[in-house]
Amino acid sequence: MARTKQTARKSTGGKAPRKQLATKAARKSAPTTGGVKKPHRYRPGTVALREIRKYQKSTDLLIRKLPFQRLVREIAQDYKADLRFQSHAVLALQEAAEAYLVGLFEDTNLCAIHAKRVTIMPKDIQLARRIRGERA
């Protein structure tokens, strides 16, 4: 289609241009110094969903080994002093603990969804444990 020259037309009503606020006008007239770019941010929930997919794919342990080992030793001291642990024993305990927690959080999430919520709460954990028969 061939280009045609635009001719000025008389306005027939419509909205009158609004006056700019003083701050908006000052912002437009002031030159930008340095051109600092705002860092990119994902929408709320996007990173959480990405992390969920990442951790569901992986099979490695999520709790750090040394803090878990310290916790095991601290709990064991309540029962008997000077206990020694093989490294494989601590790893087996960690595998079992993480498997238990993952299962508990899955059930907790189902309890939250049943209550028409997406956020898990302590009452969901309590309900999941009660249904499992772990806590009366």
Swiss-Prot record:
GO molecular function terms listed in the Swiss-Prot or TrEMBL record: DNA binding; protein heterodimerization activity; structural constituent of chromatin
Residues bearing the modification Phosphothreonine: 12
Tissue note: Pollen specific.
Main location class: nucleus
Cell compartment(s), UniProt: Nucleus; Chromosome
UniProt modification remark: Acetylation is generally linked to gene activation. Can be acetylated to form H3K9ac, H3K14ac, H3K18ac and H3K23ac. H3K9ac could compete with H3K9me and prevent gene silencing. H3K9ac is restricted to euchromatin. Methylated to form mainly H3K4me, H3K9me, H3K18me, H3K23me, H3K27me and H3K36me. H3K4me1/2/3, H3K9me3, H3K27me3 and H3K36me1/2/3 are typical marks for euchromatin, whereas heterochromatic chromocenters are enriched in H3K9me1/2 and H3K27me1/2. H2BK143ub1 is probably prerequisite for H3K4me.
N6-methylated lysine sites (modified residues): 5, 10, 19, 24, 28, 37
InterPro entries named in the record: Histone-fold, Histone_H2A/H2B/H3, Histone_H3/CENP-A
Disulphide-bonded residues: none
UniProt keyword annotations, A-Z: Acetylation, Chromosome, DNA-binding, Methylation, Nucleosome core, Nucleus, Phosphoprotein
GO cellular component: nucleosome; nucleus
Record function comment: Variant histone H3 which replaces conventional H3 in a wide range of nucleosomes in active genes. Constitutes the predominant form of histone H3 in non-dividing cells and is incorporated into chromatin independently of DNA synthesis. Deposited at sites of nucleosomal displacement throughout transcribed genes, suggesting that it represents an epigenetic imprint of transcriptionally active chromatin. Nucleosomes wrap and compact DNA into chromatin, limiting DNA accessibility to the cellular machineries which require DNA as a template.
Family assignment from sequence similarity: Belongs to the histone H3 family.
Protein name: Histone H3.3a
Species per Swiss-Prot/TrEMBL record: Lilium longiflorum (Trumpet lily)
